From Swiss-Prot:
A divalent metal cation binds at residues 632, 746. Its EC number is 2.4.1.175, 2.4.1.226. It comes from Mus musculus (Mouse). It is found in: Golgi apparatus, Golgi stack membrane; Secreted. This is Chondroitin sulfate synthase 1.
Length: 800
């Protein structure tokens, strides 16, 4: 027993000694070597490996800059981005180097996992900050057959062993580098592959391209891709291909050369027509017009975009799509965090709880009738709303239409995600009807009834119309703030001080942010003088309203001595019985405030608001700020400051959405009305969303858009006409609810002699001023339903 125990101990000891010896001989030298060499690093974000030069032969300069436009994970998942993966040669000409070539270099070239060079004629300008390769012995003549072949020879001679794939592209194509990389990584570059959109020629060219039955070529416009093996086989024979050409089409001849010497031709695949997109629209103008299309999303290359602004437009759209995808990914991560926290018993952060709540129409539970979020009914063209202040039916504006198109497109992409494996495809036909609402806490919600076409292409082929209900939500992502310019605290404090209202106290705190002046500095800041506002009031009759307006003007402008000028555009017609009293009232105010800038300007003829404002504005120069006002309004000093801030000469016009009072006899049910005109409730009034008469505009911009249509008589239409002119002139319109202006209720009298359009608008305006829908309904029920009890449960149920 003792001998057996000693043998066991000796065996264990011998094993330990042998283990240490083997470790010292095998493991330690390897660890020392790794320590000397240092850790292997992944490619840097700019695409250059440690020790690798940024520039390559051929004139490329800084091709790795801007590679951070797309995330590193945008390639095939799990595969590091290889900057020596793809070489793109762009055919251009000297006359396009400053335009198309620069646009391509600044947009899609940054997404290519490799190198991009622009090939032009001999003697081309190489001082342009893009990688230009002037091809020796090549000119810019069209068709560019020699240029195309010599570019391929250049690729072969300089880069054959450095890149796996080679692409011939036009300068008016757009390439999605991340999508292209994912596609090419699924293929073997060691095999002879010739990729692009398969072409046979136009109907008129059939039989004239020297193509045998079954032969084809890759169309040059959307781009042509060659594997390294194809380029290796055909490049040595380029001279022979140049001498033996049968057509003037360079893409046909390149395809012929590849087929003859590489032994392959353009792949026969319907999918290539979608991946390499060519715009076949009738009357095409050289650019891709409709970006909100599934074709645009599926494509890898898009052609043509001959005008550089449209290239930048397309790139901006692609970046916005990428941002949307990243935002959606963040929402998914927040949801995963919330889900995992339930299993790990960890505390959920407030942000995760807000953004990670799963999709549901019950995310918000209303506790009162007023909190219920109502749905808007929609069809393909119109929105129907029961919201106070909104018309019962209105056409969809461009933003709403665009949003709906994007939603439908995303739905169809989800439905057809596995269409190939299922042997069917579903096409969208139209929206039968739907519902829409916006939850301010969580996002937009839709219920859509869709008419679709079910197309089965496996087994028994069939096409069947089907209807499907889609319940959709667009969740809000995290709020972000972006400062386009660095904040100047001193300038901001000065702008706040211009306002004599309650906000001026804020500037005292902001001044603490301003850098201290050096000792002995003589600099003294002077507050800029605020811009004078010229208030124009067309007036005919309405003396009582004029008295109230002048009382508000005195309190708001005259007593604080604000920098404004009041111009009363007084009509001299016999139909104005109050003319003498109005002139007398203005005289009294001028005596009381001799330094105030006030003027009465006579206007002849029958009343025309357009004519009066045109006459009044003619008194000012182009730098004057005009405020088109009415006598039945009251406004505050804060509004005047916003009038200045929201109106920019040559750029922006302010069309405030003002609050209009309901009839106080209905609102207060015969009781004494409140003296506070600025009470904003659903019961007291509504926002005039479709009124454009109250305007802040510079005289120069008024002249630029063509001024008022003085042929319009009476009230109405002149404001809509001016608004349309502003939009058509390309000026920005600023629209927002304005709490500093209130339209005081007064009886509306519609003259039957008005133009039919004006008369209809007048009747609509009159009907909207009686009271809110809920209050009018309650009044009707009180008179016609004896069982109705205001405020009771029965009444509440009936009016909800």
């Amino acid at each position: 027993m003792a001998a057996r125990g000693r043998r066991a101990w000796l065996s264990m000891l011998l094993g330990l000694v042998l283990g240490f010896v083997l470790a010292s001989r095998l493991v330690l030298p390897r660890a020392s070597e790794l320590k000397r060499v240092g850790p292997r690093r992944r490619p840097s974000p700019e695409g250059c490996r440690p020790g690798q030069e940024a520039s390559q032969p051929g004139g490329a300069r800084g091709d790795a800059r801007g590679a951070q436009l797309w995330p590193q994970g945008s390639a095939a998942e799990g595969v590091p981005r290889d900057r020596n993966f793809l070489f793109v040669g762009v055919m251009t000409a000297q006359k396009y180097l400053q335009t198309r070539a620069v646009a391509a270099y600044r947009t899609w070239s940054k997404t290519i996992p490799g190198k991009v060079e622009f090939f032009s004629s001999e003697g081309s300008d190489t001082s342009i900050p893009i990688p230009v390769v002037p091809l020796r012995g090549v000119d810019d003549s069209y068709p560019p057959q020699k240029k195309s072949f010599m570019m391929l020879k250049y690729m072969h001679d300089h880069y054959l062993d450095k890149y796996e794939w080679f692409m011939r592209a036009d300068d008016d194509v757009y390439i999605k580098g991340d999508r292209l990389e994912s596609f090419l990584r699924s293929l073997n570059s060691s095999e002879p592959l010739f990729l692009g959109q398969t072409g046979l020629g136009t109907t008129e060219e059939m039989g004239k391209l020297a193509l045998e039955p079954g032969e084809n070529f890759c169309m040059g416009g959307p781009g042509v891709i060659l594997s390294r093996e194809v380029l290796r086989r055909m490049a040595p024979h380029i001279g022979k291909c140049l001498r033996e050409m049968y057509t003037t089409h360079e893409d046909v001849e390149v395809g012929r050369c590849v087929r003859r010497f590489a032994g392959v031709q353009c792949v026969w695949s319907y999918e290539m027509q979608q991946l390499f997109y060519e715009n076949y629209e009738q009357n095409k103008k050289g650019y891709i017009r409709d970006l909100h299309s599934s074709k645009i999303h599926r494509a890898i290359t898009l052609h043509p975009n001959k005008n550089p602004p449209y290239q930048y437009r397309l790139h901006s759209y692609m970046l916005s799509r990428k941002i949307a995808e990243l935002r959606h990914r963040t929402i998914q991560l927040h949801r995963e965090i919330v889900l995992m926290s339930k299993y790990s018993s960890t505390e959920i952060q407030k942000e995760d709880l807000q953004l990670g709540i799963p999709p549901s129409f019950m995310r918000f539970q209303a506790r009162q009738r007023e909190e219920i979020l109502e749905w808007e009914f929609l069809t393909g063209k119109y929105l129907y709303s029961a919201t106070d202040g909104q018309p019962p039916r209105r056409g969809m504006d461009s933003a709403q239409r665009e949003a709906l198109d994007d939603i439908v497109m995303q739905v169809m992409e989800m439905i057809n995600a596995n269409a190939k494996t299922r042997g069917r495809i579903i096409d969208f036909k139209e929206i039968q009807y739907g519902y829409r609402r916006v939850n301010p806490m969580y996002g937009a919600e839709y219920i859509l009834d869709l008419l679709l076409l079910y197309k089965k292409h496996k087994g028994k082929k069939m096409t069947v119309p089907v209807r499907r209900h889609a319940y959709l939500q667009q969740t809000f992502s995290k709020m972000q703030f972006v400062e386009h310019e660095e904040l100047d605290a001193q300038e901001l404090a000065d702008r706040i001080n211009q306002d004599s209202g309650s906000l001026s106290f804020l500037s005292n705190s902001l001044k603490k942010l301003v850098a201290f002046q050096l000792p002995g500095s003589k600099t003294e800041h002077k507050e800029p003088k605020e811009k004078k506002i010229n208030i124009l009031i067309p007036l005919s009759g309405r003396f009582d309203m004029f008295v109230r307006f002048m009382g508000n003007f005195e309190k708001t402008c005259l007593i604080p001595n604000l920098n404004v000028k009041l111009v009363i555009l007084l009509f001299n017609s016999d139909s104005n019985p109050d003319k003498a009293k109005q002139v007398e009232l203005m005289r009294d105010y001028r005596v009381k405030y001799p330094k105030a800038d006030m003027q009465v300007l006579p206007v002849s003829g029958g009343f025309s608001r357009a004519l009066a404002l045109e006459v009044g504005s003619s008194q000012f120069n182009n730098e004057s700020l005009l405020f088109f006002c009415d006598v039945d309004l009251v406004f505050t000093a804060e509004f005047l400051q916003r009038c200045r801030a929201n109106t920019v000469l040559g750029q922006q016009i302010y069309f405030p959405i003002i609050f209009s009072q309901y009839d106080p006899k209905i609102v207060y049910s015969g009781k004494v009305p409140s003296d506070n005109h600025f009470a904003f409730t659903q019961k007291t009034g509504f926002w005039r969303n479709y009124g454009f008469g109250i305007t802040c505009i510079y005289k120069g911009d008024l002249v630029r858009v063509g001024g008022f249509d003085v042929s319009i008589q009476g009230w109405g239409l002149e404001d809509v006409d001016l608004f349309n002119k502003v939009v058509q002139a390309g000026l920005k319109t600023f629209r927002s609810q304005e709490v500093g202006v209130v339209h005081i209720h007064h009886p509306v009298v519609c003259d039957p002699n008005l133009d039919p359009k004006q008369y209809k608008m007048c009747l609509g305006s009159k009907a909207s001023t009686f009271g809110s829908t809920q209050q009018l309904a309650e009044m009707w029920l009180e008179k016609n339903d004896p069982s109705y009890s205001k405020g009771g449960s029965h009444g509440s149920a009936r009016t909800a």
